Amino acid sequence: MKKIAVIGGGASGLMAAITAAKNGADVTVFEKNDRIGKKILQTGNGKCNYTNLDMDDSYFYSSSDNGIIKKILSKFNEKDTIAFFENLGIVPRNRNGGIYPYPETATAILDVLRMEVERLGIKLSLSNTIDSIKEKGTGFIVNSTFFDRIIIAAGGKSAPKTGSDGDGYKIAKRFGHKPLKALPALTQLISNEKYFKSISGVRAEAYLSLYIDGRFIKKSHGELQLTDTGLSGICSFELSSLISRGIDSKRKAEVEINFFNDLSKKDFAELLRKRIKLQPERPAELLFTGIFNKKLSLLFLKMASVSLNKNSGSLNEKELATLSDSVCSFRVVISSVGDFAKSQVTSGGVPLNEVNENLESKKKKGLFFAGEVLDVDGICGGYNLQWAWSSGFSAGKAAAFD
């Protein structure tokens, strides 16, 4: 019976431990907190969107992927995840493809994982920081105990209050790995533009286009939240990993916002002409009434240098074009992103080209990785938890059988 140490008692670590134990291994989970699964409780705003029915590798980012993400997801996919938790007692709730536990509380997921850990006799070493890992023969000495295999599932640097502080990267470096710089992802976008204070609190459906050094990179869509420092909301979060990387490499990151149903500037200008024709005497201040929030409307007019008291019917073609440009092509230069304390996941980590298809290290046999410690981060919607389940399953099974 192989003795396996799992470093980290989060989602990927617990899945790795459970999988290894089911395959006959003697498993010990080392967790620096006084309880396991602390970060799980924060997922999905506490509701725990634990997977998604629309799942493939295109929803993940990695600057070192060589096809491994797709292979890992195929070994334990979203259907396997749903079945796994159903067998533990979770009834799934489908919300537009996002899968939640029926009571929509993360404690339900953590509770069944705890019960399975107990049922399988997995040992928990809590409030335990790893002081040393040494090689011994074909195995390892963790602190003072021998193990045949080690699975590093210590997470990244996001949400440090849950215990994620980059310890996994330090361990990886001891064995010759070169983790890519850890950066915040799934976090707010910060701009130096002063006008954001005037529109803080506004929410609007929008299409966002990301440009790095003037080159189009990616598009997203959803509810955008405007804050006093910039952009928030899922659609902006989905661009944050790429923006983080761009800014870190000293490139210009710019987001173009279309506030009106992805309509072209030409078509929106025509829409304005029709509105003006109906009520040409209406003051420009009221031109967007029924379309946009007042705060946003006033900003559009200000950016187009249009007087609030001017009759809509007297707006010239240049002013209409400028207004349409403000609405459909609102450009925001991003100066930075939210820090690790505000981010949901980490971009960067152990490069995928430094592990094999079972997530075993190419540098040291018997050393495996799972979860956020690897150079993989997904968008919002259950994708990062699916990566945790899939990678944990793959590492746990391989470690037990290797």
What do these predicted ranges mean?
Residues 3-29, 395-400:
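N-terminal Rossmann-like FAD-binding beta1-loop-alpha1 element of flavoenzymes
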Residues 5-7, 30, 130, 146-161, ...:
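Short hydrophobic core segments
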Residues 28, 34-36, 41-42, 50-57, ...:
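An anion/pyrophosphate-binding glycine-rich loop and adjacent beta-alpha core
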Residues 45-94:
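Glycine-rich active-site loop/strand segments that organize a redox cofactor
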Residues 126, 297-377:
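A glycine-rich dinucleotide-binding beta-alpha-beta segment and adjacent secondary-structure elements
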Residues 126-139:
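A conserved short coil-to-beta-strand element within the FAD-binding core of flavoproteins
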Residues 149-195:
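Glycine-rich loop(s) and the adjacent beta-strand/alpha-helix scaffold that form part
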Residues 158-171, 175, 376-402:
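A conserved FAD-binding loop/helix module that cradles the flavin
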